[in-house]
Amino acid sequence: MKDSENKGASSPDMEPSYGGGLFDMVKGGAGRLFSNLKDNLKDTLKDTSSRVIQSVTSYTKGDLDFTYVTSRIIVMSFPLDNVDIGFRNQVDDIRSFLDSRHLDHYTVYNLSPKSYRTAKFHSRVSECSWPIRQAPSLHNLFAVCRNMYNWLLQNPKNVCVVHCLDGRAASSILVGAMFIFCNLYSTPGPAIRLLYAKRPGIGLSPSHRRYLGYMCDLLADKPYRPHFKPLTIKSITVSPIPFFNKQRNGCRPYCDVLIGETKIYSTCTDFERMKEYRVQDGKIFIPLNITVQGDVVVSMYHLRSTIGSRLQAKVTNTQIFQLQFHTGFIPLDTTVLKFTKPELDACDVPEKYPQLFQVTLDVELQPHDKVIDLTPPWEHYCTKDVNPSILFSSHQEHQDTLALGGQAPIDIPPDNPRHYGQSGFFASLCWQDQKSEKSFCEEDHAALVNQESEQSDDELLTLSSPHGNANGDKPHGVKKPSKKQQEPAAPPPPEDVDLLGLEGSAMSNSFSPPAAPPTNSELLSDLFGGGGAAGPTQAGQSGVEDVFHPSGPASTQSTPRRSATSTSASPTLRVGEGATFDPFGAPSKPSGQDLLGSFLNTSSASSDPFLQPTRSPSPTVHASSTPAVNIQPDVSGGWDWHAKPGGFGMGSKSAATSPTGSSHGTPTHQSKPQTLDPFADLGTLGSSSFASKPTTPTGLGGGFPPLSSPQKASPQPMGGGWQQGGAYNWQQPQPKPQPSMPHSSPQNRPNYNVSFSAMPGGQNERGKGSSNLEGKQKAADFEDLLSGQGFNAHKDKKGPRTIAEMRKEEMAKEMDPEKLKILEWIEGKERNIRALLSTMHTVLWAGETKWKPVGMADLVTPEQVKKVYRKAVLVVHPDKATGQPYEQYAKMIFMELNDAWSEFENQGQKPLY
């Protein structure tokens, strides 16, 4: 009861406080809620306002298509008068911007056919109305440039604002012509480079560049004045046939001729009556016989009809090409005008134009001038006092602009600027590089002729700069030929230094210049007594040559330096005079040529081993069927030891391999023993090829290692001299067995031509001397032994053995080698895209490095085939080889791949497995 009473007593006291706290909480929460809403709203409005302000600021500053080419020449796109969302240049924005910077000091030149209210720009708008997709008339171009110059001359604060529909081609040709008019540049190249740098993507067509060249002629130091003789265009010839029909094998062309914007002649007739030209026709010939004068435009179109009945069919046309020129710049004796593809306008789809596409006009100039009503603006124009600084606000800006025009990349050589942007018939025109001075005369804006504007074409070539040449030319550049003349001069030969005391007689100082810088092998060859230019068999030469002598004496130049197959009557080792070692210097005995004469003969010139060695010329080389003994050093690092010392009575390795045969370093000589049996070793040849051989003073037990078996040589000091590790001197008290040779010969047979490294070195420098001899001897080994039994040592390949080989031989006599190579490539792989792609690296032309060979494992799925095929097309596409010597070859490869891909698609693009 007490607890309940206490509960009842406490409840009334708690209810008021509980209710007040609840309302207080709701009140405070609502206050915080509205406060948060208010703060969030203020932040949102503030953020929105700041973003709007920022967007307006960025729009007025950065979103306008507005470019200062110079501080006084401005280029922009067309200012739109009405509100168009997404259009960058609004008239009001442009006016606000110009008024804020150039109030009352700007004039707008509208080059487009569209117009707007000129009051928006304070009625300072010149309507030029240049034609669309054409170069402006030369008359109008010159007049606008002169008007701009007059406006800039009136006040240093005046600026010119130029615009067309997109601010690209038409505006760029006017600004470029203005640079030439003010003598800033004398050729079109630097002007166009400056425009590309300031406003990328200007898209000047060949006709635009041609007209800039006309401006250079008109304003040269000796200005060219166009003649007024009418031109008769007799016919137009187009070859080869472009591919504009649906079958991509021809077109149905017609031709329009315009003077300015006025069409004066057209060959378009009824669709059914017009001739359709095919590829097999070779060329398009259309007679015209029309006389023109001034700015001439020749356009050719392809006429096609949509599918449907005659009443429902709709005839449309597609432009094939367009060309424009001024008749006043054609030389008087011209009869043919040729335009190649780079000199034609509107050639936007390269796949539709075959290689070597060109247009030829058969023309004739009339002998008399035609009377014109309007005097050209360049007539009686004084070329004085025209200063290019009028285009800039400061001298520094002038210099920076010149540098910018000269530093842009160059695509066309600047050596002949007079033919810049012209076709071949302008060859006789004089495009001067000299600056000319001109004076100005006031002209009203009403003198401008109204013509249509021009839209930008595709961006074409960047052009060369004469300023770049002027800056790059150095007066000392002519000294380069003299440097080249000094390079091949041989350095003075080193003096003869007898460091080891091996020679006592004076040496000849006349040396021939070495063919290559001396190598280690050449230096070491002198240590063995052979010069770098000495003959392979210098039997008459006794003694050891200088250690550091890089080349042989002049008296030994009559013999070839290296001879793998030449023989000599005295095949002696050049360490001494004898092929075998005789410590007592017994005179050598010349022997006749026999089966083993090259191994057993000694030097024909005997010498005393204990006397000072003397030099003698090379002996006479006699022909023999056996290879010569040669220790001539190999420049690649090996030594050619073409005879086995073991056969001469010294075991497998004799002391003749060392530069000094005695312990005192005296050059000793060997001679053939008097009782040597020449056939003593024949019985042990088969069993001793790879066996360990003891080194005995006699050669009866010596064997012959394989030809290409490298023998490791390690120098060992022997009383002031050195000796190979595996070879033993006759003075050694006890023999030492030789380690077995590694088997590297392809056949197990005796070899009489030993080749091993005589000096320690890298592994790749040992045993290389026999490589060039080995291949020559394998072809006819044992031919003399087996020929009597009806065997041939090698295959006699005198002619083709199969009908296919005979057919190929006949085809090679008449067919183009490139086509023959393509036929060999596709043989057995016709229309097999996988096989062709995996072997395409075998037929690519020399110098092609983009293509990486692919295997059949990379061509399993259709997706892989498609990916590799696209890469192959990018490599061999004919358009990328335009003008290259392999252009036709790339086209043949592309056609084979294209046919194979079509077959692959027709078969459903099946996977490999």
Swiss-Prot record:
Coiled coil: none
Keyword vocabulary terms for this entry: Acetylation, Chaperone, Cytoplasmic vesicle, Disease variant, Hydrolase, Neurodegeneration, Parkinson disease, Parkinsonism, Phosphoprotein, Protein phosphatase, Repeat, SH3-binding
Location in the cell: Cytoplasmic vesicle, Clathrin-coated vesicle
Enzyme Commission number, as recorded: 3.1.3.-
Residues in J domain copies: 849-913
Sequence positions bearing Phosphoserine: S112, S453, S456, S563, S570
Subunit record text: Forms a complex composed of HSPA8, CLTC and DNAJC6. Interacts with HSPA8/HSC70 in an ATP-dependent manner; this interaction stimulates the HSPA8's ATPase activity. Interacts with CLTC; this interaction produces a local change in heavy-chain contacts, creating a detectable global distortion of the clathrin coat. Interacts with AP2A2. Interacts with DNM1(GTP-bound form); this interaction allows clathrin-coated vesicle (CCV) formation at the plasma membrane.
Protein name: Auxilin
Naturally occurring in which organism (per UniProt): Homo sapiens
Gene this chain is encoded by: DNAJC6
